[in-house]
């Protein structure tokens, strides 16, 4: 298992540069999650990636999809900025007039997938209630009452919660590393306990150093 885990860490580190702690945390959970595929019940895992934009959160979600399902395109992405209004939850789940909800329909078509929910804190409270049901029960009913199972999905949420507090305490490149408790506290203060407690792991992403940014630029240029 350790060998498998170290191979996975190496593989993910090639995809996501400069985030060793995040890569290690996700590797642990992915190894467990892969063993839970085809288990009935809850999703195989739920992660919350916290940190500034442009530091590798989406890349790590794609790498997770590739590891679990053999294809980085097995990623169903939802930007919660687009689900801020009352009625947003109905769009995701489905209504009598449009029974195929955006989320339920996507998962019915592709039941083995990573579901990436960007900027989770922006979603309407009713949307968060829908996600709470997914995390707790592993299923939703669409507009026609058909059950959609999430038991072969990995839920990855992203958030900027805590970024402002952290940026006030560190300079460029995180010269003085901030304890991860700052991120956890920001998330815990924002969400209701029943939602917070359903998250398997909160994974902090840190501001990239100049050296890492140059390394990323070289990788992009070489592609």
What are these regions (language model features)?
Residues 1-223:
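AAA+ P-loop NTPase nucleotide-binding core of proteostasis motors
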């Amino acid at each position: 298992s350790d060998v498998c885990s170290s191979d996975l860490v190496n593989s993910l580190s090639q995809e996501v540069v400069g985030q060793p702690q995040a890569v290690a945390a996700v590797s642990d959970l992915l190894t467990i999650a892969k063993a839970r595929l085809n288990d009935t019940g809850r999703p195989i895992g739920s992660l919350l990636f916290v940190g500034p934009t442009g530091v590798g959160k989406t890349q790590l979600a794609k790498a997770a999809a590739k590891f679990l399902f053999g294809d980085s395109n097995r990623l169903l992405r939802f930007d919660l900025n687009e689900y801020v209004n009352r009625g947003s939850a109905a769009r995701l789940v489905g209504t009598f007039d449009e029974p195929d909800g955006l989320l339920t329909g996507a998962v019915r078509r592709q039941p083995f997938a990573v579901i990436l929910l960007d900027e989770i804190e922006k979603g309407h409270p009713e949307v968060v209630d829908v996600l709470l049901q997914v995390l707790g029960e592993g299923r939703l009913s669409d507009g026609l009452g058909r059950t959609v199972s999430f038991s072969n999905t990995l839920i990855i949420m992203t958030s900027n919660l805590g970024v402002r507090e952290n940026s006030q305490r560190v300079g460029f490149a995180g010269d003085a590393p901030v304890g991860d408790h700052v991120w956890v506290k920001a998330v815990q203060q924002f969400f209701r306990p029943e939602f917070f407690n359903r998250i398997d792991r909160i994974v902090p992403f840190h501001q990239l150093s100049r050296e890492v940014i140059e390394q990323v630029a070289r990788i992009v240029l070489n592609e």
